[in-house]
Amino acid sequence: YGAIYASSINLSLFEISLYMMIITSAGALSQWPIGYLSDRIDRRVILIGVSFMASGLSLFFVFANFMPLTLFLIFTGLFSVACLPMYSLTVAHTNDFLQPNEIVSASATFGILIGIGSIIGPLFVSTFMEILGAVGFYIYLFLIHGLLGLFGLYRMTQRTKPRDLESQYNPLPRNISPAGMEMNPVT
């Protein structure tokens, strides 16, 4: 829906390409510094931080029509830095609580959840965009990331992080298959 949003705010074909390139490259490059931090700081803190960062940055896009293109693309990159590493952070955090023989099953569950989200998400986003216009895309993302951050704060009060089971962060694409996880020598 990023390209649909960009087209809806009247970006040219080249500008839409820049927008999509920045989303992908900034998100990919942010995996390493965010992963490095999450190996040294409680992953929940990092997850909550990037959730609220993504939520807050989403609000800037409500005013995208009034921004110069350069500023719009900078905010796009910052949003992507906060948003794209969330899947890998969540997998690493989950693995902190699992035994090695449980990792493949958990990864399969993540695959199913991503699939469900990929089906349901566009229905909600399109509804927001239909009702609110192009800004509905980022208003939806503002709400989703804000709720994730609040859920993370709530969960921090429910259990502590087990230091002895902590796993290393690995940047993972969202579409990794359970078969790929079976190649993990730990399992």
Question: Which role fits each region the language model picked out?
Answer:
Residues L84-Q99:
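Intracellular juxtamembrane helix-capping segments at the cytosolic ends
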Residues T24-W32, S118-I119:
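Residue-level signature of mid-helix packing/kink "hotspots" within the transmembrane helices
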Residues V45-F60, F142:
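Structural signature of the two symmetry-related core transmembrane helices
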Residues L13-F14, L98-F110:
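Loop-to-transmembrane helix entry/capping segments in MFS-fold secondary transporters
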Residues T127-H145:
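A membrane-interface helix-boundary motif in multi-pass transporters
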Residues Y1-E15:
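Short amphipathic helix-loop junctions that connect adjacent transmembrane helices
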